[in-house]
Amino acid sequence: MLAGGGTAGHVNPLLATADRLADLGHSIEVIGTQEGLESRLVPDRGYKLTAISKLPFPRKLGLSTISFPFKFLAISLRLRKRVREADVVVGFGGYVSAPVYLAAKIFGTPLVIHEANALPGIANRFGSKLTKHVAISFPSKLAGELIGVPLREEIASAEGYDIGQARVELGLDPSKPVLLVTGGSQGAQKINRVVVEATDKLRAAGVQVYHIAGSGNEYPEKISDGYVRVSYCNSMELAIRACDFAISRAGAATVSELTAMGVPALFIPYPVGNGEQRHNVAQLIEADASLIVEDKDFDVEFINSELIPVLSSKKRLKEMGQKMKQFGKLDATEKLVTMALGAIK
C-alpha cells in the first residue's frame, strides 16, 4: 500500500516506487484524494486509487482543533481492513498520508516513510515518530537514510535519448539551444508572464523556449518559430533531455529530475509556505551548479542581464551541467523498494 498525494513532489516518487514494485510482481493499492494530482495520474498509470478525505492539520486554535483528533482517528479506523491486508505501507507525505500512518501503527502493518523535501512536512514528521524506516532526499532535520527522490524509469533512462531527436519531437530546431520553462505541476502565473514578455529577447539571443505553462493558465497553447507553449507535458523526460537550461520552481521532484540529467537551472522558490523549496536547492546554489532568484525579483530585466549571458556561454553551461550531475541520484527507487521489502521481514 502506497499513500500520498497533492503535488508532483508526493505523486511522482510514489508512482516510481509503484512501478518498480509492480515489476517485481507485487500488487499495488494507492491511498490518495480526489483533489490532488494522484486522482488522475494513479489511474492513468493502471493502479487502484482509494480516495479518502483530506484532513489538514489545524494551524491555530479553534473548533477545528477540538474536532480534529476524532475525525483523524475515524479516518484511520475506516482504513482497518485495507491496512491489515497490506504487507507494508509506504508513505510519501501530504495530509492524506497521516491517517494511513496511524492506521499502520494501530494494526501492526510495517510502515516506511519517504520525505522528498529538505524541510519535512507535518504528515511525515508525525509518521517518522511511528517507524524506524525513514528515507530522506536531502540533508534534513528528519533522521533517516539519505537516498534521494525515486525517479520514474522514463527519467532515469532518458540519457539514452538523442538530444536532437528529442527537440524535433517537441517541435523545436535540433541545432539550437533550448530553455525549458516550467512552474511545476500547478504552473506559476508570475513565471509564465515574465517568460512570455521576455520571449523576443530570448529568441534574439538565439535561444529556443519550451514553455510548460500549467493547467488553468491564461495563455493558450502556441507553436511559433523557436517558441513552444503547452499546458501540460506528458513526456517530461523528453523536455528535460532536449534542454540546455531550465527555469523552474524548486520542488523536490523537479530538482531531482534536473540533477539526475545534469541540467542546470534558474530556480525561483515558491514564495508561499515554509520555505522548503529554497532548502531543496541550497547545495546546488552553493556549488554554483544553478542560479536562484526570489519570485519578487524575477522580471524581464533579470532574464536580459543575468540569464541570457549564462545561456550564451557554452562553457558555463557545460560546467554547471557537470556540477548538477554530481548531485543526481539514479538509484533512489531501488533503495526505497529495498527498504520497503526489508521492513516486511
Question: Can you annotate each of these PLM segments?
Answer:
Residues H10-L21:
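Short amphipathic alpha-helix
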Residues P309, R316-L330:
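A short, well-ordered alpha-helix in the C-terminal region of glycosyltransferases
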Residues L2-G5, A22-A74, R78, E294-D297:
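Conserved nucleotide-sugar phosphate-binding/catalytic loop shared by glycosyltransferases and other
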